[in-house]
């Protein structure tokens, strides 16, 4: 049955809200409720969130646990930061694939309040200030205009959860139908859309920077790629952005399981487009 995605800064009250939701649904629907979260993974969060690969592995483990628990009867609550829009999109693809309704509960706090609540925790449960600040800086707020962030319920510190509205969103709304893009999306690769967006942007900026000291005929090395750009002519920002959009659209429909190859694929695409 439905997936409830918690979202918010570290120490923003997500776990308390997840527990309130579990208690409500257990008492009022009789359904089994599963809370999946960072704590279940037995992690040292300061170590994990300081290392991008460890964090990526954590997201993959959480997504896999959600996928295992989603079924036609139970409610699953994912109690984690869920702060990357690409990861939320991947979870949206998962629920479309399994024909399951979902909603997002956004625990909205200020950075100062989250920092204050962090200091109130037991010492072994606190984030370091450096990690806390970094996560807040990287946070990508949900936007109800994005289908993967909708329905969206934004809850501030003193608000009560709108239980009935959340129930309506989960039980009276049809699950999103699968379509070609979600069938093609490689659900086994964590954060595919985020990586696609980031890597292609990095390649684009590397090309623009290298062109300042290059001339037609040069080979341009790109960080993260073994392939090189064959600079047959100069490319301006407008053209590069257009090519990047075209490549992203194509790759969404024809995804690769190996996200480490995205940079090489984009370089090859640019080389073909210049000839």
UniProtKB/Swiss-Prot annotation:
UniProt keyword annotations, A-Z: ATP-binding, Nucleotide-binding
Pfam families: KTI12
Swiss-Prot/TrEMBL GO biological process terms: tRNA wobble uridine modification
Recorded superkingdom: Eukaryota
Residue sites binding ATP per the record: 8-15
Gene Ontology MF, one: ATP binding
Keyword Oxidoreductase attached: no
Entry's family note: Belongs to the KTI12 family.
Name this protein carries in UniProt: Protein KTI12 homolog
The organism of origin for this protein: Danio rerio
Gene that specifies this protein: kti12
